[in-house]
């Protein structure tokens, strides 16, 4: 039960809404209202002249008309966390996660394919682990075994690029696309991007000719087009913008235009729909380390002490580290740890032949990973160590498997151009 109130401030401003209960993170000196437009607003108690109770409200039960029968092959929705499938009661401010396909049909304005929805886990994306990548991969495979035309994975955006890359390596071939989708704006905000992103992801899995791991999110800050990025070539580039996800060193594989309900494939180079062939194991003893000026070598040596089997370094420029950590890098390699190099610049590619420092790293046994993104390299290292013998891993890392690296850099794609 919640209270609807009128808050009168000392300066004469008046607000009406539902008073939200405090949480463990709330400031005890703040009163929070859920306004009619869906936004929350907070007031310091010292600014409030009067609070007038206007009545009580109850949580509205979830209801939706039964979805009509839809013909065709099913699309599976696998929920892993995040707010994209949450329903918000604008009266009480309560958030209700729902996997009801009837409700989905209603909020999306229809579905172009029959839907099955399941929950895999309920995790903040920062709590994802390589072990959970394996769990998600197994559930994706189960969906395909049940006849799914495609699988939509609902995922928090902060680490979506890691999971997308992991699934790209896990599935050598698949009967359909694996589309990861999320929302930058939670569904209790008028500017939410959840509905359009999900609608686009379902369209991709139902219609696309390719069968790859992709990220489906807004291409622009408006609602005119949604981009479909390769899972190994995408990165979250802004903390809050709707168009935060960008393809790096390449362009999106497809675009979805909601006004025309048009899915436009932008390349003829892709993995086609086929049989199911996957390996869902990932090694947890892998580290991703960013080099910085003044880095203490003990930080790298500590990775050996905790049993790391693989280390991906984000080096400067062409893929360099400071002279002071070279002995630590050599110590890791001499102990049998696989060490690979990516670049902090993201765009461009690692080249350890240009400067002496790069050649020193090569002579130690550091593996240059061309134009592979650091997060993608981390996922590939985890997958390779879990599924191949140690002596095979360097070859696997430098062999293109899921379009994660290219033979040349296209200057026209720098900065998303």
Swiss-Prot record:
EC numbers on record: 6.3.5.-
Record key words, sorted: ATP-binding, Ligase, Nucleotide-binding, Protein biosynthesis
Swiss-Prot/TrEMBL catalytic activity: L-glutamyl-tRNA(Gln) + L-glutamine + ATP + H2O = L-glutaminyl-tRNA(Gln) + L-glutamate + ADP + phosphate + H(+)
InterPro entries per UniProt: AsnA_fam, Asp/glu_Ase-like_sf, Asparaginase/glutaminase-like, Asparaginase/glutaminase_AS2, Asparaginase_C, GatD, GatD_N, GatD_N_sf
Top-level division of the source organism's lineage: Archaea
Enzyme class: ligase
Pfam families reported in the protein's UniProt record: Asparaginase (PF00710), Asparaginase_C (PF17763), GatD_N (PF18195)
Domain Asparaginase/glutaminase: 73-400
Single Gene Ontology MF annotation: asparaginase activity
Residues annotated as the enzyme's active site: 83, 157-158, 236
SUPFAM superfamilies: GatD N-terminal domain-like, Glutaminase/Asparaginase
GO biological process, one term: translation
CDD domains named among the record's database cross-references: GatD
UniProt record similarity statement: Belongs to the asparaginase 1 family. GatD subfamily.
Function: Allows the formation of correctly charged Gln-tRNA(Gln) through the transamidation of misacylated Glu-tRNA(Gln) in organisms which lack glutaminyl-tRNA synthetase. The reaction takes place in the presence of glutamine and ATP through an activated gamma-phospho-Glu-tRNA(Gln). The GatDE system is specific for glutamate and does not act on aspartate.
Family matches, as NCBIfam families: asnASE_I, gatD_arch, PRK04183.1
SUBUNIT field: Heterodimer of GatD and GatE.
Name of the protein: Glutamyl-tRNA(Gln) amidotransferase subunit D
């Amino acid at each position: 039960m919640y209270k609807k109130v009128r808050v009168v401030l000392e300066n004469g401003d008046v607000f009406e809404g539902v008073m939200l209960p405090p949480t463990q993170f709330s400031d005890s000196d703040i009163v929070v209202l859920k306004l009619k437009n869906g936004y929350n607003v907070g007031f310091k108690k010292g600014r409030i002249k009067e609070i007038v109770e206007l009545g009580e409200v109850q949580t509205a039960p979830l209801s939706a008309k039964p979805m009509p029968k839809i013909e065709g092959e099913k699309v599976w929705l696998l929920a892993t966390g995040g707010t994209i499938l949450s329903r918000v009661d604008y009266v009480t401010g309560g958030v209700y996660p729902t996997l009801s396909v009837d409700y989905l049909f209603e909020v999306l304005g229809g579905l172009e394919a029959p839907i099955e929805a399941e929950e895999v886990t309920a995790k903040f994306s920062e709590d994802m682990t390589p072990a959970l990548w394996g769990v998600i991969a197994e559930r994706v495979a189960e969906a395909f075994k049940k006849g799914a035309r495609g699988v939509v994975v609902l995922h928090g955006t902060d680490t979506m690029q890691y999971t997308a890359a992991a699934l790209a390596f896990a599935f050598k071939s698949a009967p359909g696309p694996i589309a990861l989708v999320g929302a930058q704006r939670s569904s209790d905000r008028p500017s939410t991007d959840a509905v359009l992103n999900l609608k686009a992801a379902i369209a991709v899995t139902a219609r696309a000719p390719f069968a790859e791991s992709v990220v489906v999110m807004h291409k622009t800050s408006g609602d005119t087009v949604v981009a479909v990025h390769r899972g190994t070539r995408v990165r979250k580039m802004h903390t809050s913008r709707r168009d935060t996800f960008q393809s790096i060193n390449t362009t999106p594989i497809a675009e979805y235009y909601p006004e025309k309900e048009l899915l436009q494939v932008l390349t003829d180079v892709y993995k086609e729909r086929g049989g199911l062939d996957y390996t869902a194991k990932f090694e947890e003893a892998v580290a991703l380390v960013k080099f910085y000026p003044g880095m203490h070598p003990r930080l790298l040596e500590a990775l050996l002490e905790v049993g790391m089997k693989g280390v991906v370094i984000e080096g400067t420029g062409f893929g360099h580290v400071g002279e002071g950590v070279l002995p630590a890098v050599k110590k890791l390699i001499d102990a049998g740890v696989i060490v690979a190099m990516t670049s902090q610049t993201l765009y461009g590619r690692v080249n350890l032949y240009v400067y002496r420092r790069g050649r020193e790293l090569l002579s130690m046994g550091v593996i240059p990973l061309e134009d592979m993104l650091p997060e993608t390299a981390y996922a590939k290292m985890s997958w390779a160590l879990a599924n191949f013998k140690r002596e095979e891993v360097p070859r696997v890392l430098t062999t293109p498997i899921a379009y994660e690296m290219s033979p040349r850099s296209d200057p026209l794609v720098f900065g998303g151009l």
